[in-house]
Amino acid sequence: MTSSGNPTCRVGLIVRLTLSILLVAATIVPPLGAQGDSAHALPRGANGPPPASPLISPRALEDVAPDPHTVEVYLTASPNRLSLVRGSTTDVYAYNGQVPGPTLQLREGDRVIVHFRNNLPVPTTVHWHGLHIPASSDGSPFHPVAPGARHDYVFTILRGAAGTYWYHPHPHHQTGYQVAKGLYGAIVIRAADDPLPASLPEKLLILSDNRFLPDGSIDLPDQTTLQGGIDFENGREGNVLFVNGQVMPTVTMRSGEVQRWRVVNASAARVYRLALTGHTFLHVGSDGGLFEHPVELTELTLANGERAELLVRATGAPGTRATLQTLAYDRYIPQTRPKDWNQPRDLLAVQYTHDAPEPPATLPNVLRHVPALDTTRASATRVMALSQGMINGRMMDVSRVDVSARLGATEIWQIENLVGMDHPFHLHGFQFQVLERNGVPERVRRWKDTVNVPKHETVRLIVRYDRYPGKWMFHCHILTHEDHGMMGILEIR
């Protein structure tokens, strides 16, 4: 535990005292998630179904490099005022004037130069979530960019990195606030030898949520209020759900058509349990790219920070519709469980056109080889015990190194969730493979950088610290939790 003079510790103490009072009150009032309508008020004009609008992908960052093997872009974070919901405008922070930010389109082997400018009134960073790049370009809290300052992020995309990633700020104590204000965007990395047909239409789905006051402003309550205490405990969830910054957009498909969907969970805390009415998914990729073999699913659970690649085959009759929903998922402590946690929420509509059916697409059964990390080469097994707001009983201290290891080492991490709510665990800088959950071997070998650890469960993973030394973060990816100290520092030498 850090000293009592640490601001994080003082805030955490206030929040815990507040929650102690709330938990006592829960014995005589409904659960804390069952607050009145004012806590979940929608802006004027936001009620009722939105007019049908086609799904729009965020525009791509413009590459200004003359060299075909270099991607050079300009990215600026600035205050802005945008319309996020019907009938209102909202003060936001935006990358290049849009929410979500523009998509960074890359290829394996690219040298990447991002000229970043911070026009915000506060320090910020840009964290390239999931990318295996030098620590100096990771955008961690160690490298803040001051208001008005510029910083160049320079890195190379390695072979085998093709997949779907995202970027967001990572300043100490301020990540959740800045993401809630609108700072997040997607990264798509392509491989020259992608095994999936290039003819497949591709959709990018960035899932997010937010909460608004009646005047359209973003609801960010003080931590010592009732709603602020709930946000601290649960992580901040919104009552408006977005796909690419849109409410309930529409995707059109021909009967029989197969589309490739790249899905990013950019929410601060919400877990999406995705299902498309009348359909199954072919799950073909995760955080670190494609699997060896497709896996057919009726639903997919995606924790915040995780990504997925899905193949969706249109099976509906011409003129009909299907709905992509997030189904009930109980990740909460019972006393702070929202009253509507068990209600499905609509995300996106699929409209089947009257065009002639699409001829069946031929899809490969083998996508790529995913080599297993060798458990016999693990030089250590480390236990990471997740409690409320702490890892191994300690809160984050930027002056302390929690784990030291040598460059090139392979280790096993045992992530133990000691409390009654889920914690998604994220490791910066290195992809890992999940070995087992509660002693049950993982069915699909895949590269991950974020893994959900459900309440009172244990996940074992294996990681190899290759190529890049330096200091790296590991933390719960519920943003209010990481902001209040549920993080640690890994140093690779």
Residue ranges and their predicted role:
Residues 113, 164-166, 260, 321-323, ...:
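Short, conserved beta-strand segments of beta-strand-rich sandwich/propeller modules, principally
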